[in-house]
Design a protein with these regions (language model features):
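Cleavable N-terminal export/targeting peptides
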Residues: 1-33
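Outer-membrane beta-barrel initiation region
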Residues: 2, 26-91
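Residues that define the transmembrane beta-barrel architecture of outer-membrane proteins
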Residues: 40, 62-68, 96-100, 129-133, ...
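Transmembrane beta-barrel strands of outer-membrane/channel proteins
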Residues: 48-50, 83-87, 116-120, 149-153, ...
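Residue-level signature of outer-membrane beta-barrel architecture
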Residues: 74-76, 106, 139, 151-153, ...
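Repeated loop/turn-to-beta-strand initiation elements of outer-membrane beta-barrel proteins
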Residues: 77-83, 110-115, 143-149, 172-177, ...
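Detector for outer-membrane/organellar transmembrane beta-barrel domains
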Residues: 128-191
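Outer-membrane beta-barrel "beta-signal"
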Residues: 206-211, 241-255
């Protein structure tokens, strides 16, 4: 019997979450103290809410846009429901590059969560949106590098992955410099979305913020993005640039 795309995605998501739960239970039984989970709490971080002015390498017009990147969770120390959102809204145009993830996270070792769930993604190009099953990890590496990495399987069986690395350098008690690096790869091309096989794109950002309060910090910075391989070829075929640098200014807040 042939399954529909929606049923395939639901099945893949269920398998991913089951695998996450089983592995998390096994690892936590070995590494984490079997104390009852803490009371339910919540946390929301608006890591980026910014105006961007992008200058493209191909000489196209500068583009002004609003960009956001948020994350939040509800739960205890060991079990959490995570929600991630990210997107770009040009001032002259519709919302694009929209990304929403809803994940179950389980603490498996100190500072590291194993996560699984579902994702909705609308690419920067004019291609169709897709739904994905997600399995990933999120936590703090040695020297307090923040790491988030995930693998995605779409409703059509397309496999891709994304990794992000960031660090917070305290210049003073209030001035903080935050470099951030992100990379996307795909196991096969998805022409409708303008995604090529292999390395798709990389992004590097550097933001300097001033914490008026810990919960509220305006910032300025720069960001650079470059597409590669088949993804760059698809972009050129649409008349788009393959890279560019941006000046950014925004606010970071949490509650």
């Amino acid at each position: 019997m042939k399954l529909s795309s929606g049923k395939k995605l639901a099945a893949a998501s269920a398998i991913a979450m089951l695998a996450c739960s089983v592995l998390a239970s096994f690892v936590s039984a070995q590494e984490v103290s079997p104390v009852e989970d803490s009371p339910t709490r919540s946390y929301v971080l608006v890591d980026q809410f910014e105006h961007t002015t992008t200058r493209y390498t191909g000489g196209n017009e500068n583009e002004d846009a609003l960009r956001f990147n948020t994350s939040g969770w509800i739960g205890g120390d060991y079990n959490r429901l995570w929600i991630y959102t990210e997107g770009t809204k040009p001032y002259k145009g519709k919302l694009e590059d929209a990304d929403v993830q809803v994940l179950y996270g389980r603490l498996v070792v100190p500072f590291w969560d194993l996560q699984a769930g579902i994702r909705y993604f609308k690419p920067l190009s004019s291609g169709p949106s897709r739904n994905y099953a997600v399995v990933g990890v999120q936590g703090l590496a040695p020297y307090r590098f923040g790491v988030q990495a995930a693998a995605f399987v779409s409703e059509r069986g397309d496999v891709s992955a994304r990794a992000e690395l960031e660090y917070e350098l305290l210049l003073t008690q209030r001035w903080i410099l935050q470099p951030r690096f992100a990379i996307n790869i795909a196991l096969k091309a998805v022409r409708e979305q303008g995604i090529g096989r292999g390395l798709n794109d990389v992004e590097f950002g550097l933001r300097l913020r001033y914490e008026i309060r810990r919960e509220f910090a305006p910032y300025i910075g720069v960001s650079w993005q470059k597409r590669y391989g088949g993804t760059a070829q698809f972009a050129r075929a649409r008349g788009e640039d393959t890279g560019g640098g941006s000046l950014v200014a925004g606010v970071r807040l949490w509650f």
